[in-house]
Curated annotation (Swiss-Prot):
Its main location: other. This is Alpha-catenin-like protein hmp-1. It comes from Caenorhabditis elegans. Disruption phenotype: Worms arrest their elongation at the 1.25X to 1.5X stage. The lineage of its organism: Eukaryota, Metazoa, Ecdysozoa, Nematoda, Chromadorea. GO terms for cellular component: adherens junction; apical junction complex; catenin complex; cytoplasm. It holds the Pfam family Vinculin.
Length: 927
């Protein structure tokens, strides 16, 4: 805020990093501007009273400031800072007195321009002085925290340099006490920070500090006990570097600087998902504005970048061959659909007549993009499912080998563990390419980076344990690294679950169970002429059975976690019951039968004849079917609470449930039967044709939203009527797909009648606007569009009598309603287009060509206000199926965290007492 006149001081509001400081500055700004600005006085309020209020506020500020300076914790250690505070407070006092005097002079003669300017200048000087004092006080608070960081750094350095275990233990106890003391102030500071990214970075550094302390302790003790081993030194150096990095990050964020590595910098949306979103937004171009020289290269460039990013996922190691082929096919389909759309754009250049070719081309590109998204998502879920199938066994096998003291086996297991770690890190990073959830992406990328650095140290700890298998210190060190690894893997798994849709996960799990079953069948039917070959076949069957069991239990864990966050209902109980059946019955039955089969193969596999192999193969298939059917039952239970629009599958139309299409097939269908259900039973070919028309209607709907929804309905009946007509037409088109609020033919007829009524009102109002406007081409266009609305409303009334024709062929009912459904959708689209053109023409006629002597304005053309934004920005998820976590109630842990924050904000005195108590304990301990 600059100061004018004699004022030469400036302060930048962006320099304020504390919410409390910002709040106090804002409050004082309101007090001062109440005097210097024109505003209505409240009943009983006087201008002299405002000056008195300001005087009291300044006096209270000076008193509070003096008390705070007297209690400043650095009063003895840094007298220079205290002097600066006194000087800043003195400036507040001086400028406050001047402001009160000039303010009093101004309110007594408020018509004086000179006195107003002097009062305004004095107010700015006072605000600048107060802001400088508060910013200085805040910087001293930061210095106090930084001093605590330096204490922790010094203690950590002493512990690293310690040469006895007793010193290490004593210094570690002191370090933990200092970290706990620092943690209280850091949490308080994090809540008070204005910028969210600084708050996230500070909390991430705090978390890293707390997690690194136990590793530093065990690594240092191990190095003191076994200094002759290079692995011990590497562990200690790693933890020392991590400790220093965390402390440096804390200090940088506290000082308002950018740390070398921050948590917030990982929150970047992947290039591929960004390209797909941009591409879908760019393909819808007004044909009149299409330019071949710029639009074609731009769209083709976006398409090729999408294809390139998709190819990197398709070529990844764990991508299934069939999924790869689908991705390649969809990329080619997307290219072809884009070229056809661009060709239609170029054909329409200079042509005024509208046709369905461009909307149909846009709908086709959207459909191909949607299909490509689905295949890419499920390819990534393939990777996640394989990499995170068993995250514990590689490390457990490594530790067991190390405890046995077998170096060769330990190094082999270490290599396998490192490969496993590299796989989960690469899969985690790959998954971020298709997620727009910034928070989850930040957690995934940050945790993956930590795991990448931690994995070699876990291997070093295991090799050290292999060299000293009886050392208690080495065992404790290994245990600490193991716990740290599992904690971070658990966090990474949770974050990946947050960006994975349940439908994708279950669909992929079903497919993987089938793959594992086929792998087991190959192990059963493979020929074995030697014991080694038979053992290899047995291992194949055993691994396949273990994978199936692991995938089934993983399904149970994921679905149970989702249901735990939903309120109890019949739906959740149905899903939980399906999970219980899989977990407590089917998995155990499968494990028992698979184990018995493996034992039989191990004992008699060399003597199996083809008939025996076929019997054992059927036994394995039946056992796998138990698990596969149970997983499918869980998926069906989850879909019971979904509408058709929520299901993103290879088939656009889904049956209501098992047996829904055949239920009561032989009964006679009456006139009053729910026609919506009959529309769902249309032949697939008719459904596809109807869906193509609906896709075109959605393109027109998008144009409607872009042209009409930007206007405010308040005071504009044209916009209100148009929006209402659009909503009803959407319901009518949904009826042709067998969903939506309209159930019977009578519902559709009533909806058409309501559209006709709204169309008549719109026609009358727009015609009056046209009559009041000057003669122009716009007036002629408006009247022409109104005649189209009348025509299409009449056609819609006729088409609304859509009814499914039912004929019986043998024992099956054949439903057909293609012609009437197609006519209904096409008429609704034409009507919607006419409404859009009418709104545009009415706006131009009423604002640009209105006659000067016309009556009062019939409608008010105002831009719609921005939609209300939630206090907490919701996470954006491009997936079709939303995870239950996005509609779940507030988690108990989150409620507790909010309670803790409030307690920190309101209970500062208790924190201060706790800090004083810890400080006194440290002093007594040193004495």
């Amino acid at each position: 805020m600059p100061a004018n006149g004699n004022s030469h001081a400036y302060f930048n509001i962006d320099e304020v990093r504390s919410k409390n400081v910002l709040k106090q500055i804002t409050q004082l700004i309101n007090e001062v501007t109440n005097i210097t600005e024109t505003f209505p006085l409240k009943p009983g309020q006087t201008t002299e009273g405002l000056v008195a209020t300001l005087d009291a506020a300044v006096a209270n500020f000076l008193q509070t400031g003096s008390f705070a300076i007297s209690k400043c914790p650095i009063a003895n250690s840094d007298p220079r800072a205290i002097d600066l505070l006194h000087e800043a407070l003195g400036a507040v006092q001086d400028t406050g007195q001047v402001m009160i005097q000039t303010g009093r002079d101004f309110v007594r003669d408020s018509t004086s321009t000179n006195k107003r300017a002097i009062a305004t200048n004095s107010g700015r000087n006072l605000l600048t002085a107060v802001a400088k004092f508060l910013i200085l006080a805040d910087s001293i608070d930061v210095k106090v925290i930084v001093d605590k960081v330096d204490e922790v750094r010094e203690t950590a350095h002493q512990m690293i340099e310690a040469d006895t275990k007793i010193k290490v233990d004593d210094l570690y106890n002191l370090l933990i006490s200092q970290i706990e003391e620092l943690d209280i102030t850091v949490r308080r500071r994090a809540i008070d920070l204005v910028k969210p990214n600084q708050r996230d970075d500070l909390l991430a550094a705090r978390s890293a500090l707390r997690q690194t302390a136990p590793l530093l302790y065990t690594s240092t003790r191990t190095f003191v006990r076994h200094p002759e081993h290079e692995e011990a030194r590497r562990n200690r150096d790693y933890t020392a570097d991590e400790m220093h990095s965390a402390l440096n990050a804390l200090e940088s964020v506290l000082n308002g600087q950018q740390p070398k590595v921050t948590f917030s910098e990982y929150g970047r949306i992947g290039d591929l998902i960004n390209e797909i979103d941009t591409f879908q937004n760019r393909i819808e171009i007004d044909p009149a504005h299409y330019r071949r020289g710029t639009d074609r290269p731009d769209l083709e460039g976006h398409c090729e970048r999408i294809v390139s990013g998709s190819a990197s996922i398709a070529d990844a190691e764990s991508t299934r061959e069939n999924r790869k082929q689908k991705i390649v096919a969809e990329c080619n389909n997307l290219r072809q659909a884009l070229q056809e759309l661009l060709t239609e754009y170029e054909k329409s250049t200079g042509r005024r007549d509208d046709n369905d070719d461009i909307p149909l081309g846009i709908a086709e590109v959207h459909k191909r993009t949607k299909d490509l998204r689905r295949h890419l998502r499920r390819a990534i879920v393939d990777h996640i499912s394989d990499a995170f199938l068993d995250t514990r066994t590689p490390l457990i096998l490594l530790i067991e080998a190390a405890k046995e003291g077998h170096e060769e086996n330990t190094r082999y297991r270490s290599k396998m563990f490192q490969e496993h770690a590299n796989e989960i890190v690469s899969v985690a990073r790959l998954s971020c390419q298709l997620s727009s959830d910034v928070e989850s992406v930040s957690v995934i990328q940050h945790t993956a980076a930590q795991l990448e650095k931690l994995a070699p140290q876990v291997a070093q700890a295991a090799i050290l344990l292999c060299h000293q298998p009886t050392s208690k210190t080495a065992q404790e060190n290994m245990e600490t690294y193991k716990n740290a690894w599992f904690d971070k893997v658990r966090l990474l798994t949770t974050a990946l679950d947050n960006i994975t849709t349940l439908d994708d996960f279950l669909a992929v799990s079903e497919a993987h169970i089938v793959e594992d079953c086929e792998r087991g069948i190959k192990g059963i039917t493979a020929n074995a002429s030697t014991p080694d070959e038979n053992a290899a076949n047995c291992e194949t069957v055993d691994c396949a059975a273990g994978s199936i069991r692991g995938r089934a239990l993983r399904v149970c864990d994921v679905v149970d976690a989702e249901m735990d966050f939903l309120q109890n209902s019949e739906y959740t109980e149905t899903v939980k019951q399906a999970v219980r059946i899989l977990k407590t019955q089917r998995v155990d039955q499968f494990a028992e039968r698979a184990s018995a089969l493996a034992n039989r193969q191990e004992a008699h596999g060399l003597t199996w004849d083809p008939k025996t192999k076929e019997e054992e193969m059927n036994e394995f298939i039946n056992a796998c079917t138990l698990v596969h059917d149970a997983v499918k039952d869980i998926r069906h239970a989850l879909l019971m609470n979904r509408s058709m629009n929520d299901v993103d599958s290879d088939v656009e139309y889904e049956a209501d449930g098992v047996g829904a299409a055949n239920a009561d097939a032989n009964r006679t269908i009456s006139e009053q039967e729910n026609q919506q259900n009959l529309m769902r039973r249309l032949p697939e070919e008719e459904k596809k044709k109807i869906q193509a028309q609906i896709d075109i209607f959605k393109v027109t709907q998008t144009r409607f939203e872009r042209e009409v929804a930007k206007w405010d309905e308040t005071g504009n009946d044209i916009i209100s009527l148009a929006n209402n007509m659009c909503k009803i037409m959407m319901s009518m088109t949904e009826f042709t797909r067998g969903c939506g609020p309209l159930k019977t033919t009578m519902d559709v007829i009533r909806a058409a009648q309501e559209i006709s009524l709204n169309g008549s009102k719109l026609n009358a109002l727009a015609r009056q606007i046209g009559e009041e406007s000057a003669d122009s081409q716009t007036k002629k266009d408006l009247l022409a569009y109104l005649s189209q609305i009348t025509l299409y409303c009449q056609q819609l009334n006729i088409c609304s009598k859509v009814k499914a024709d039912v004929t019986q062929v043998g024992n099956e009912l054949v439903v057909s309603a293609l012609d009437s459904a197609m006519s209904l959708i096409q008429t609704a689209r034409n009507l919607l287009t006419a409404v859009v053109q009418t709104v545009k023409a009415a706006y131009i006629a009423s604002t640009k060509f209105r006659r000067p002597n016309a009556n009062s304005v019939r409608v008010e053309w105002r831009m719609a206000p921005p939609k209300k934004q939630p206090l907490i920005r919701p996470q954006k998820n491009n997936a079709i199926i939303r995870r239950a976590s996005e509609r779940r109630p507030l988690q108990p842990a989150k409620v507790l965290a909010e309670f803790t924050r409030n307690e920190i904000e309101t209970g500062r005195d208790s924190d201060d007492e706790e800090l004083d108590r810890r400080h006194q304990q440290r002093i007594n301990g040193r004495l």
